[in-house]
Swiss-Prot record:
Family: Belongs to the long (4 C-C) scorpion toxin superfamily. Sodium channel inhibitor family. Beta subfamily.
Role this protein plays: Beta toxins bind voltage-independently at site-4 of sodium channels (Nav) and shift the voltage of activation toward more negative potentials thereby affecting sodium channel activation and promoting spontaneous and repetitive firing. This toxin is active against mammals and crustaceans.
Primary location class: secreted
Secreted in keyword set: yes
Expression by tissue: Expressed by the venom gland.
Compartment(s): Secreted
A GO cellular-component term linked to this record: extracellular region
Entry GO MF terms: sodium channel regulator activity; toxin activity
Keywords, sorted A to Z: Ion channel impairing toxin, Neurotoxin, Secreted, Toxin, Voltage-gated sodium channel impairing toxin
Protein name: Toxin TdII-1
């Protein structure tokens, strides 16, 4: 849980976790 990016919709949450990153709708 290093970086969090919220989308404009406020639903998309991108988490950067080495060595890969994933986006999830919380």
């Amino acid at each position: 849980k290093d970086g969090y990016l919220m989308g404009a919709d406020g639903c998309k949450l991108c988490v950067l976790t080495a060595p890969y990153d994933y986006c999830a709708c919380e």
